[in-house]
Design a protein with these regions (language model features):
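Bacterial Sec-dependent N-terminal signal peptides
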Residues: 1-26
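Low-complexity, Ser/Thr/Pro/Gly-enriched N-terminal "stalk/linker" regions
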Residues: 24-96
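Solvent-exposed loop and edge beta-strand segments that line ligand/cofactor-binding
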Residues: 47-49, 99-111, 123, 158-174, ...
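Well-ordered alpha-helical segments within folded domains of soluble proteins
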Residues: 110-122, 169-186, 234-250, 290-302, ...
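Active-site lining segments of carbohydrate-active enzymes
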Residues: 160-286, 393, 400-406
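Carbohydrate-active enzyme catalytic cores, enriched for enzymes
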Residues: 294-461, 513-514, 632
Length: 646
């Protein structure tokens, strides 16, 4: 079991073995902005950078929480009788036996939600009635062997999912808890001492032993990326974890030299993330990961700027603005976003983060988009970011400015990301087209070089399915046995009857976008293995209001093995009643896909959705439209036209 688990786990998409299509650009923006000596002289002393009231400043908190005070207190009241859950050893081991991470995460997350609600309620009310339950939550948390998730503990030296008390692992959740509990200590340590001084001492020691010391002593946490090579993937874990480390050191470390060294260490690490990202700002992890990739990078940069009184700030750098504006440009409408890889098709982002990021980089598109999320979809009214107390406090502080901002979606008719190789185009008659080129070893990768999605009046009709509930299989060598990861369940051809392959070498070439002609084209042959026997497969997408979307596949094969099969994933059930024409309709929005009936036989598969992560988005079933070539030919051209149904 142990050997098998070690072999299977390649945590988070081949953390150690993933590669990038383009080598890093060694910008090192943070290190160029400030040296260690600059940081030492720039850090604001005595925590004077903190703009939130002290716990005992009740007038300050009444003003600060304002209209949210009652709401925040009520959330805490619901947790006054909360029974703190024990995460059992068998809950951790479940990840090894069945692959489930939910068994461990459910009680753990329940505890964290209760604790965060109680903390915000006590800050808002200030009468002490939530303190005993906060103490219970803090005490219970400190008694745990680890703050990391079972799915992440397999990166311990033991390679097992049960916490090893000899090793402190800092993952996303351990970092989140470290940051949250650092704020808890900052606000309440004197209140804890009124009950018993051992409480705050125990909490402070846990933070030292679990977070502060390991971060400075170890350089082998994969997300630190200190040893990153030009081809090493650096994903959302980096800014997310480093933000938490920065928070902990700013709040807890009293030695200014040690604090400065830790702050500079986070700068060196976050530079690796910025270096990995392309100048165009595209997020290869997709919109649903943006909040913890570029969005968490923003939190980090803002906190760093606050702590240095603006002396260490890189918000003026074009790449930082580009990374922010990606989230606004990737929004389709009515809650739908462009989703590639593991990203969900539903979302839009956290309005508060998007707004503040937009302010920092002077992007009116981001600020207006954030206002849109609140005014049109109401999702931004929830200012409580759970255990991310920094975001909650910042949401409250900036809410009035946000709701006074004019709401609008970006007006651009296209967006082109030349390095990330994403392309979005819109027409005046309601079509929104999104496609990608890229390579098959991106962060949270699916084998999807050349795929596309098509929306009509913000309704997804030809879709990217996304990903199901994460299990052990998701981040193992079994990943591509999951149907939704495979190219044959994307809007792509099976050439000679075969799908694309996983690996950095499987990539697009000759990728071109013509903004005047509204044409996106690529050669996707390189995304298929040698066994496919394909020389070229040039796909051209052309989007014109009057003619809709025209897709042209021009190909040359070395030899013939099996029929080519062109797949289209659809939300609506395909209507094949007319030869050469397929109607795809969902909720009164319909398109017609036209093909040459002399070239293809059309059919479709029904794909039941039993995974709640997918069924919550798409419902009970999806469909795969299949155009199977009638003739086996070495060279040829296929054309498909998709237009709105009148």
């Amino acid at each position: 079991m142990q050997k098998n688990l070690s072999y299977k786990i390649l945590l988070l998409l081949g953390i150690l073995l993933s590669y990038q299509l383009y080598a890093h650009d060694y910008r090192n923006l943070l290190q160029k902005k400030a040296s260690l000596e600059n940081v030492k002289t720039s850090l604001v002393s005595n925590k004077q950078w903190i703009k939130y009231p002290n716990y005992t400043d009740r007038a300050g908190w009444d003003k600060y929480t304002s209209t949210f005070k009652t709401e925040l207190i009520q959330l805490g009241v619901k947790q006054l009788n909360y029974e703190w859950k024990v995460v059992k050893a068998t809950d951790y081991l479940e990840y090894e036996t069945t692959g489930s991470r939910v068994v461990m995460e459910k009680p753990f997350t329940g505890n964290l939600t209760a604790l965060s609600d109680l903390v915000m309620a006590e800050l808002s009310e200030g009468k002490g009635r939530f303190i005993p339950q906060i103490i219970n939550g803090v005490w219970q948390t400190c008694e745990m062997s680890s703050w990391a998730l079972s799915a992440h503990l397999v990166t311990q030296k033991s390679k097992r999912s049960l916490p090893d008390f000899n090793e402190q692992l800092i993952d996303l959740t351990a970092g989140d808890l470290g940051s949250f509990l650092s704020w808890t200590y900052y606000f309440f340590n004197k209140e804890f001492d009124k009950s018993n001084p051992i409480i705050s001492k125990k909490l402070r020691k846990n933070l030292q032993d679990r977070i502060l010391d390991p971060y400075m002593e170890r350089s082998d946490y994969w997300w630190q990326a200190f040893n990153a090579q030009p081809s090493t993937m650096v994903n959302n874990w980096n800014p997310w974890c480093n933000f938490n480390m920065l928070t902990c050191y700013l709040l807890l470390e009293e030695n200014p030299i040690k604090q400065a060294k830790a702050v500079y260490r986070t700068m060196e690490s976050v530079d690796k993330f910025i270096n990995y990202n392309h100048e165009d700002g595209g997020c290869e992890e997709g919109p649903s990961y943006w909040g913890h990739a570029a969005g968490k990078m923003y939190d980090y940069l803002q906190l760093l700027s606050n702590a240095t009184n603006g002396k260490v700030s890189i918000f003026n750098e074009p790449i930082i603005k580009n990374m922010g504006e990606y989230i606004a440009k990737s929004y389709v409408g009515n809650g739908w976003v462009v989703n590639f890889a593991d990203a969900s098709a539903k979302g839009g982002g956290e309005a508060g983060v998007i707004f503040r990021y937009g302010q920092a980089v002077k992007s009116t598109d981001m600020q207006s988009f954030a206002a849109y999320l609140i005014s049109r979809e109401k999702n931004g009214d929830d200012i409580n970011a759970g255990r991310d107390i920094f975001r909650t406090l910042e949401n409250i502080a900036n809410h009035n400015s946000l709701i006074q901002t004019k709401a609008a979606l970006p007006l651009n008719t296209y967006a082109w990301y030349p390095q990330t190789q994403f392309c979005y185009m819109k027409t005046s008659n309601g079509l929104f087209f999104a496609a990608k080129a890229g390579y098959n070893a991106e962060s949270h990768n699916h084998n999807d070089v050349g795929t596309f999605s098509l929306y009509l009046d913000a309704m997804p009709l030809i879709i990217d399915v996304g990903v199901g509930t994460y299990t052990r299989q998701t981040f193992s060598n079994e990943r591509y046995s999951i149907w939704s990861m495979q190219s044959n369940y994307h809007n792509l051809p099976m050439i000679n009857g075969l799908p694309q392959q996983f690996g950095a070498e499987y990539k697009a070439k000759n990728v071109v976008f013509d903004s005047l002609k509204h044409i996106f084209s690529l050669d996707m042959a390189g995304a298929y293995s040698k066994e496919v026997l394909v020389d070229t497969w040039n796909r051209k997408y052309e989007l014109v209001s009057d003619n809709g979307l025209t897709i042209t596949d021009q190909f040359e094969l070395k030899d013939l093995k099996d029929a080519n099969q062109i797949n289209f994933m659809t939300w609506g059930k395909p209507n094949l009643s007319t030869d050469g024409s397929v109607i795809i309709e969902k909720e009164s929005k319909a398109i017609v896909l036209k093909y040459n009936p002399t070239d293809f036989i059309a059919s479709y598969d029904v794909i039941p959705q039993t995974d709640t992560r997918l069924s919550n988005v798409w419902g009970k079933e999806l469909y795969r439209l299949k155009l199977i070539a009638k003739k086996l030919v070495k060279t040829g051209t296929y054309t498909y036209q998709i237009i709105p149904k009148k």
